[in-house]
C-alpha cells in the first residue's frame, strides 16, 4: 500500500508544483489545442473541498482528512491479504487524503507569515486544482485518487452484496443453510 500511496502523493505534489510554477491563478493552458474546448490545464486555488465546493471551509475538510487518515491506518491491517481491491482503494484514498492535507498545510504556513499563526491561516488554506474537463469543476490528482478509491469500495461492496443475494459465499462456494 505504501509504495502506491507514496508514488501518487509525489505525483500529486509535483503536478501541483508545476502548475503553480508555470501558470498564474486562473490562467489556462491547452496542451492539446485541438481539444481545448474539452480539456485544459487551468490553475485554480481551491479554498473549499473536493471539486471547489464549499469555498472557505477547506479547514473543516482538513480535519475530516485527518480522521480519515487515522481510520485508514487503523483499518488497513485488518483487510484480508486477498482483498487487493480494498487494499488498492485504501492506498488511493490515503494518497488523495495526504495530498490535500499537505497542500493545505503548505498554504496555511505561507499565510501564517501574514496572520501570525497557522491556526488563523487555516481558513485561507487552499489546494491547487488544475485538471479542467469543462463539464465538471476543476480538480487534481488527489481528488482523482479519492474518487477512484471510493468507487472501488462501492463496487466491492456491491459485488459482495450481489454474491450474498445469489447464494455465493465470499469464497465463491455455494452457501448452505448452516452458513
Task: Name the predicted role of every residue range.
Residues 1-179:
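Alpha-helical transmembrane bundles and membrane-interface segments of multipass inner-membrane proteins
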Amino acid at each position: 500500500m505504501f509504495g502506491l500511496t507514496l508514488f501518487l502523493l509525489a505525483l500529486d505534489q509535483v503536478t501541483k508544483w508545476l502548475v503553480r510554477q508555470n501558470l498564474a491563478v486562473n490562467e489556462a493552458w491547452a496542451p492539446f489545442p485541438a481539444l481545448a474546448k474539452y480539456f485544459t490545464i487551468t490553475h485554480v486555488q481551491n479554498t473549499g473541498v473536493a471539486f471547489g465546493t464549499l469555498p472557505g471551509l477547506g479547514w473543516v475538510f482538513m480535519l475530516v482528512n485527518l480522521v480519515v487518515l487515522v481510520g485508514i491506518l487503523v483499518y488497513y491491517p485488518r483487510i484480508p491479504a486477498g482483498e487487493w481491491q480494498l487494499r488498492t482503494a485504501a492506498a488511493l484514498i490515503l494518497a488523495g487524503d495526504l495530498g490535500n492535507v499537505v497542500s493545505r498545510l503548505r498554504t496555511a504556513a505561507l499565510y501564517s507569515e501574514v496572520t501570525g499563526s497557522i491556526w488563523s491561516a487555516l481558513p485561507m488554506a487552499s489546494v491547487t486544482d488544475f485538471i479542467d474537463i469543462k463539464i465538471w469543476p476543476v480538480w487534481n490528482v488527489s481528488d482523482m485518487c479519492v474518487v477512484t478509491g471510493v468507487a472501488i469500495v462501492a463496487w466491492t461492496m456491491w459485488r459482495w452484496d450481489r454474491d450474498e443475494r445469489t447464494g455465493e459465499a465470499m469464497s465463491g462456494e455455494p452457501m448452505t443453510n448452516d452458513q
